[in-house]
C-alpha cells in the first residue's frame, strides 16, 4: 500500500520512505534494488511501480527504508473550531508559522469525538462542532515551542483549545483520536470510505455529501476523521439499527452518493487502503481508458498467467 498515516505531513507516504526493494516475480525471478540511493535515473523505477500494486505484480521480500531521528520535543494541541472551514484553514496557518515542525494535523468531527470519549471513558478536551488534533515536533530539546503555539492559536482566534502539559496528557489526546475506529463499532455495521480530496475542497465535500446522504437515507449517521495534512478522510456511514444484511443491501447506493461527491470535488475513492475487490468497478471513473490499458499491459508483462493476487485492483 502507499499509506501515509498520522505523521504524513512531516515524513511523507510509503513511496517517500522506501529507498530500495527486493521482490520475487511470478516466474520466480528476483529483482533486488536494496542500495539506498536517493537518486538513480538508470531506467524505469520498478520500486515505485511495485509500491501500491496490492500484490498483483510481485511479492516484496525486503525493503530499504528511510529513517529519521526521534524528535526530542513534542507539543500537542486539541483545537476546537466553529466550522469546518475554520478547521481546514488552520492547517495553512500553522504550516506558515511552524513549517516542517508540524508533524500531525488530524481532523475530527464532533460525532467521532463523542463516540471516542465515551469509549475511552475520557472527557472531550473541548466542546465544538469540529476538532483538530495537531502536533509539533523538533529534533532539539526546546522549552519555548508550546508557548509559541499557544500564543499563535490565540492570535488567530482559536481560543477553544487545550495544550498537553505532560507526556500522559499528550497520550490522552492521542488515545481519543486513535480509539475512534474501535468506538464507532457501537453504532453497528459501517459502510466505510477511504477517500482523499484536495485540501481546499474538503469543506465543500463534507457539506454537499452529508446533505445528500441525509436526504437520501433517513437517520444515517456519519463519523468523519482523518489525516487532513494530505487530504485523507475516513468517511464512515451507519444506517439506523442496520444488520449486516441491511448494510450490504444499501452499500452500493451509499457508496454511489459518496464517490460521486468525491469525484465532483476532484478527489479519489482510494487514499490509503487500496482498491482491492470492492472498488474495482469504480476504476474506469477515476482512470482514463489509456491509463487502464497501460495498467493491463504492465500486469500482463509481469504476470502473464495471472497468478499474483488475481481479481484485485484492475477491472475485468
Pin down the residues of each PLM region.
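Conserved, mostly hydrophobic/aromatic
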Residues: 55, 235, 303
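C-terminal substrate-recognition/cap domain of FAD-linked oxidoreductases
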Residues: 69, 75-257, 261, 265
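A short, flexible low-complexity segment enriched in Lys/Arg and Gly/Pro that occurs
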Residues: 19-40, 83-85, 203, 207, ...
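Activity-critical C-terminal alpha-helical subdomain
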Residues: 29, 280-316
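Alpha-helix capping/hinge segments and adjacent helical runs
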Residues: 260-275, 300, 304-308
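FAD-binding subdomain of flavoenzyme oxidoreductases
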Residues: 1-104, 308
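Short, hydrophobic/aliphatic alpha-helical segments
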Residues: 30-50, 214-215, 252-266, 296
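A structural signal for short, well-ordered beta-strand segments
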Residues: 21, 63, 132-134, 193, ...
